[in-house]
Each structure stands twice: as C-alpha cells, then as structure tokens.
C-alpha cells in the first residue's frame, strides 16, 4: 500500500510551502480512506512518494482517474496567506491504496 502526492511545479512554491501542501494533501486523503485501509497502511509503514505535477488541469485529471478507480484522494487549495493567491490548487494526494492501483493513476509522473 502507498500514497502518492502530486505537487505542482508550475507555481513556484518555496520549500516550506511545498512541505506544508504535501502534508495537507496526505492527511486529507488519509482521512477519506476507510478504517481498514488506514489501519493496513499504518501497519505497513505509511509508504509515500511525492511526484511532480505540471498544472492545475493535470491534478484534476488525475483526481478523476483516482475517483474512477475508487481510490481516496484529496485536492488541496491554498488559503493565500503567504506566497500564493487564495484558492490556488497546489497538490493532490492519491491513496492510500494498493501500489498497483495508485500506479495506474500516477505511474507516469516523475519524482519530485
């Protein structure tokens, strides 16, 4: 089991902003997963990978694929208090779910 977090590279997030957005995405998708999935993922070490996304539209396309696969996912919008405009889509988390299922959604993306 794993979770993939896709962070946008086209909006110039600083390292701290990137870390916060990835964390928001991870926790949000985790909360949407079923109890069994959460427990299994926790028991297996909560494997995660952070991947590069190139646009808002790409994140929404990936979210649609995750939805069709029945995978928990979360799209994160920034509050706009620091670097970005309010409502800017920054990240997408896919999973936790089986590795092969997550890979069907995010397998073509590069590591961040």
UniProtKB/Swiss-Prot annotation:
Classification via InterPro entries: Pep_tRNA_hydro_II_dom_sf, Pept_tRNA_hydro_arch, PTH2
Transmembrane segments: none
A biological process from GO: translation
Coiled coil: none
Principal location listed in the UniProt entry: cytoplasm
Localization annotation: Cytoplasm
Enzyme Commission number(s): 3.1.1.29
Presence of the UniProt keyword Hydrolase in the record: yes
Keyword Cytoplasm: yes
GO CC terms, sorted: cytosol
Catalysed reactions, as listed in the record: an N-acyl-L-alpha-aminoacyl-tRNA + H2O = an N-acyl-L-amino acid + a tRNA + H(+)
GO MF entries: peptidyl-tRNA hydrolase activity
Family classification: Belongs to the PTH2 family.
Reported function: The natural substrate for this enzyme may be peptidyl-tRNAs which drop off the ribosome during protein synthesis.
Name the UniProt record assigns to this protein: Peptidyl-tRNA hydrolase
